[in-house]
Structure formats: C-alpha cells, structure tokens
Amino acid sequence: MEETEKKIATQEGRLFSKMKVFLLSLTCACLTKSLSGVYMNSMLTQIERQFDISTSVAGLINGSFEIGNLFFIVFVSYFGTKLHRPVVIGIGCVIMGLGCLLMSLPHFFMGRYEYETTISPTGNLSSNSFLCMENRTQTLKPTQDPAECVKEMKSLMWICVMVGNIIRGIGETPIVPLGISYIEDFAKSENSPLYIGILEMGKVAGPIFGLLLGSYCAQIYVDIGSVNTDDLTITPSDTRWVGAWWIGFLVCAGVNILTSIPFFFLPKALPKKGQQENVAVTKDGKVEKYGGQAREENLGITKDFLTFMKRLFCNPIYMLFILTSVLQVNGFINKFTFLPKYLEQQYGKSTAEAIFLIGVYSLPPICLGYLIGGFIMKKFKITVKKAAYLAFCLSVFEYLLFLCHFMLTCDNAAVAGLTTSYKGVQHQLHVESKVLADCNTRCSCSTNTWDPVCGDNGVAYMSACLAGCKKFVGTGTNMVFQDCSCIQSLGNSSAVLGLCKKGPECANRLQYFLILTIIISFIYSLTAIPGYMVFLRCVKSEEKSLGVGLHTFCIRVFAGIPAPVYFGALIDRTCLHWGTLKCGQRGACRMYDINSFRHIYLGLPIALRGSSYLPAFFILILMRKFQFPGDIDSSATDHTEMMLGEKESEHTDVHGSPQVENDGELKTKL
C-alpha cells in the first residue's frame, strides 16, 4: 500500500513538472509570437517608406496577419483539442518562423533604396540643381525614362511581406486557444488566473524585446554594408529614412523556430492537477485517467461541432463579451499600430526614439499589471461577479484618464508654403499655390521635391532651392546652405538639412504624455485578467477551446483586419505633402497636419471604446440573474460552470441543461 502511494506521489510530481514545462514553453511561445507581431508593427513606417506606399496599404499589410489567422482559428480551436495539442503548437511556431523569414526576403531581391532628393551625395557642383539658380532653362520634373519606371515596379514586392505576414498568422493560430484550453483542462481552476497572468506577462515581455529590437534596427540604415553612410544627406529623424527592417525579421524567424522544440516532447494529456480521484495506478506503476477526465475527452470527440456553436451563440454573456471585445480592440489596435507615427509627427521624434519610448514607458507597466491582476485573483479568491465589477470600474477610470491626452499636444512644424507663409504667419493648410513666393520665383525650383532645410529664422523650407539658397559648404548631413534669400534672421541667411526641432514646451508635454501612458497602461492591464476570467467562466469546460477560438475569430474579422486599413485611410487624409517617385507617382507621406492627425488618432479610439461600455453594462446586469457555484461554495471553484438562478430551488444551465436539485448532482451533470 505504501509503495502504491509513493508511486502516486512520484507520478504526481512528474505531472506537476510537465505542467510547469508546458507553462514555461507556452510562455516562451507567447513571448516570441508577440515579439514578432510588435516588431512588425514597429517597422510599419519603415516598410511604408521602403515601398513608397500609403498608410492604408501599410495597414493592410499589418492586418494581413489576421487574415491568415482568420481561416484556421475556429477549426484549430475545436478540432485541435482532439489532436496532440503541444505538437500542434510546436508546428505553429515553426510556421511563424518561416513566415518571418519570407518577410525579410524582399530586401535581398531589391536594389538599393533611393530616397527622394536633388542633392548630390558628394556635393558635386555639376549637379547642384538643389540650389537657387536664376534663369535656369531646365525645369526640374520627375524622370520619365521607361527603364526607370519599370524599375519602380520593385515596390510591388510589399506583397511578399504581406504573404509572409499571412503565413505568420497561420502559424500563430493554435498557440493561444490550444494553450489556454490545455491549462484549463489539466491545472487547478484556482491556479488558472495566475497561470494566465504569467502567459499575459509573456505576451507583454515579448513586445518589450520586440520594441527594443525595432528601435535598434530603425537606427541602422536599410542598405548597411552596401553604401557609404557618410554620403547620406538624411538622418534617422528624417521622414525619408528607412531602417534595417529586414534584420529583425531574421531574428524573429530564428527565435520562433527555437521555441517550437520543447513542444514536441510534451505529452498529449495530463491528469487534472490535484484531483487524485481521476488518477489510477496500474500494476506496472503507470498512471491512467478515468472518471471525469476520460468522460470529458470522450465527450469532446462525440459532441457535434454545430451544437457547440449553437450553445455559444445562445449564451448572452458570451456574445456581449465578444461585442465589448471587438469595440475595445478596434480602439486599441488603432492606437497602438500608429503610435510610433503619432510620436514622430506630434513630438518630432525619430522612429527609433518613438519605438524606444513605447517600449520603456508603455509595456513594463502592462506586464506588471497582468502579473498583479492574476495574483490578486488567486490570492483573494475573487469571485466571477466581483471580477466583472472590478474590471468594469477600472476600465472606466482608465478611459477617463485617456481623455487627458487631448491636452498634451504640440503645434504643426513651421514649414513655409505648407503650414505657414514665407513671412512666418500661419495660414490655411492644403494650399498648393503658397509653395512659391517672391523670394524664390526666379529660382526655377521643383514644387514637389521634399528635401527640407531649417533656416536660422526657425522656419523650415521644402528644399534649399525654395529657401532661395545659392551656396553651400560641407558634405553629407553636415551641409550648410548660405545666401538664402527667403531667410531673414538678424542678417544671417543660412540653413541646415532637416526640419526644425520642436521647442522645449513640446518636449515637456511629451514627458507628461509618457507619464500618463504609464498610469493608463498599468490600469488597463489590471482589468485584463478579471475580464478574461469572466469570459472563461461563462462557457462550459468542453466549449472553452471553441469559445476562445470563436472569440479570436470575431476579433480578427471585425477588428484586426479592418481597423488598420480604415484607420490608415483616415490618416492619409491628413497628409500635407506626399513624396514623389521617379515617374511622377505618389509615394509615402512626408508630412501630416498634426491637428487633424491628433483628432483622428485620439478621437476615434475614444468613440469606439466609449461605445463598448454599453454591452459591458448589460453584462453586469445579466450576471445578477446568473449564479456561479464559486459564489456559494469556494470548494466548487473546480466546477465553475455558470447556472441561471431564476428561483432558489430551481437551477437551469445557461446552455439549456436539465434541472438539478443539489450541488452534488450539479457537479455530476457538469
């Protein structure tokens, strides 16, 4: 007898170790998948400039990840539970790695990146068309050489990036639904909040590394190793700069493939941790499952797929939770996807600086909030109803704080002919005829070229020619233009490359913006675990995997795919000046009206998230009519199926189960 008990204890220790290995492996998988996703998001502006595409097309590339996920999520979530879940997750990690590898390939098949400029890299006087020269006979126009126009077709290689992102989405499909269902099936229910909190921490730790990687790659010129960077006339803060986006995708490919290895050595199933009655020891010392665990597995095989779908669609709390999530995620995706671009345009930061600030100020508090939220749920054994009220109140408070972002804004950069007149007076935007003035009408300047210079008077000009500059000294980024007729500043009339920097007042507002971001991110993450536990507890155990998959499917269809596209299209409408390709085609946007940009970037998420509190409020009302076994008896937390309590003596399952007379029968039914 003692020998049998020792075997049981030894086997339970092994099972516990395997659960920890699975949890660690799944956390690493969540980390690498989120690393890849956030890195992709951080490089969106670089890809937009590399291929000279609009923000809406860049949003389509970003949303293509959801397209790949879309076609497989529901079927993987349902049928994946019948397969070897750890192995399926491992295969998904390999596919993600291959997708990242494909996304980096266009760099190796394209020529060197040629940014829009009229300045010769060596400052050769024979090609000084960037200066103001009176009586110039040749007007600067886009090149119409057919050979060069064909060369521009390389920009269509963004499709390869999109296909790679679709493949990455396919590989990501099984990780979350199968991973969470595996934990829910084989771990104590009271430990689930902590385990999910650890997973969420991994999901946020991944973006931290992804943003740091993105910040590093954004500082490296895209053609590093094949060009002399000393000859460049642009810096990382220039809107024409393209960082080495392809390097990060190679890193993501490697870590995703390495993460897949442990999953191929994990078992298909584990006995429910802590439930000895579900474990039997045979004569040869092996552990076998019986009872509830076996019945649940058989039930999952025999149940009809459409029956589960019908139950989920008839679950009011589940459907309202999906509606709330879709509205919330629409606002969150729109805000996070274009946050680097917003920091660039609003506060004058380079892409590398913007990505670094996001990683330092936004993600660590989110990571901490996820962990604390899961710990609080486990430590204080918060019931499902209390968790719902907690999540709702914290979310509303965070939403009100988000409104303060409207007060932390900067003015448009002073660019003569776009945002201000040549005399420094602000005028109506989008006026094309204001580009030329009396000081440069005889210079025969191109009005489309974007080669900005900053004058000593604090006003930027679209090019040295439009500033009326006739001389220059230096080479590369150290060039200084002199004798500029449009610049009048205490007798000095020189200019340097690039837009003028924002003032100290704008820098102070950025600091307040970042501090507010820390507070908002922490509160937002605190609501995630309580809210997610409400979601998990409102469906039966055999429906959880499909429920998670359907929830993810709806978010993909109604938020993940359309949100970046329509949001990017709205941002495109705020563009003040578009880049010009060799054949005269429109390239990427070089400068935005930051006032209109701000109204869209902040206003649309506020409207979407504000509307999400209506279905969330109905969830709180409906939860009063439902009874959770855990709200009555804490020992019933392992059986947290939700029951409708219309009468004290009569309990009906939310999915339409027959009546049960006592808690013991309830456990048997479930």
UniProtKB/Swiss-Prot annotation:
PTM statement from Swiss-Prot or TrEMBL: Glycosylated.
Side of membrane Cytoplasmic, spans: 1-20, 81-86, 185-203, 268-311, 378-381, 537-545, 624-670
Residue numbers marked as site, Essential for pH-sensitivity of estrone 3-sulfate transport: 107
Cysteine disulfide links: 439-469, 445-465, 454-486
Compositional bias annotation for Basic and acidic residues: 645-654
Origin: domain of life: Eukaryota
Extracellular compartment spans: 41-59, 112-155, 225-242, 334-353, 406-513, 572-605
Gene Ontology annotations of biological process type: bile acid and bile salt transport; monoatomic ion transport; organic anion transport; response to stilbenoid; response to testosterone; sodium-independent organic anion transport
A molecular function GO annotation: organic anion transmembrane transporter activity
Sites bearing Phosphoserine, chain numbering: 634-635
Family: Belongs to the organo anion transporter (TC 2.A.60) family.
Name by which UniProt lists this protein: Solute carrier organic anion transporter family member 1A1
Organism: Rattus norvegicus (Rat)
Organism taxonomic ancestry: Eukaryota, Metazoa, Chordata, Craniata, Vertebrata
Gene name linked to the record: Slco1a1
